[in-house]
Amino acid sequence: MKNSHISSPTTLAEDFVAGKMPRQAGVGRRERRGAETRLKLFRCALQLIAKRGFTNVTVEEITEAADVGKGTFFNYFETKDHVLGVMAEIQLGKVREAISLAGQGQQAIHSVLHRLVLCLAEEPGRSPDLARALISSFLASEGVRNIIERNMQQGHKMIAEVVAAGQKRGEIDPRLQKEKVATQLLQAEMGTILLWSTHGEPALEAWIEDSFQHFWRAIAVSGKE
């Protein structure tokens, strides 16, 4: 079942998570309420997935937790798999913000990438249980994998452009291929989250911080580590 809500702009979800409910022209009360409901369903789904695992959570349980009718769920998501697409949207929004900051030229690329890796860890870093559940859902569901892969491809391209900006400014070794550096950043991020999810201590932020410092030393121009 399809509805106009399903293709609603990802920026609404991104802005809600960032605490920036849009009030610009063209975004009316109905759109804001729709974004609120969509995000509420997503948050309730995450709580249930963290407790039981993706495959053990039903649409009925998600709508009951969100206090909406089952039909409402399908106004916003084609399938249960698409709920985790909101996670991908949120993460992609953070990458868009990074490329915007890089384009403005007011911050060092080191700062832009450092901020990005910390922001990308915010959602899975809510709890080790959630991180493990998200990882297992990616492995278990082809539908989820397809959604995540599409967004990761976009994110990878944008991160590569941030890297290219760093090379032009003399911060990142120009001999490195920007695409490979982007891949390494994503590998470091995802690998760190996986390892943290099996330990839980210290906080994920500390793990990401350490991982990023090693990553940056490997790509930085000598003397700018």
Spans of model-derived segments:
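Amphipathic alpha-helical packing segments from all-alpha helical-bundle domains
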Residues: 93-96, 126, 143-169, 179-187, ...
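Hydrophobic alpha-helical connector segments
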Residues: 86, 97-129, 178-185, 205-209
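Amphipathic alpha-helical segments enriched in hydrophobic/aromatic and basic residues
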Residues: 49, 58-59, 69-70, 80, ...
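Basic, helix-initiating cap at the start of DNA-binding domains
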Residues: 1-52, 56-65, 82
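Amphipathic C-terminal alpha-helical segment
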Residues: 123, 161, 165, 185-202, ...
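An amphipathic alpha-helix adjacent to DNA-recognition modules
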Residues: 35-43, 55-56, 67, 76-100, ...
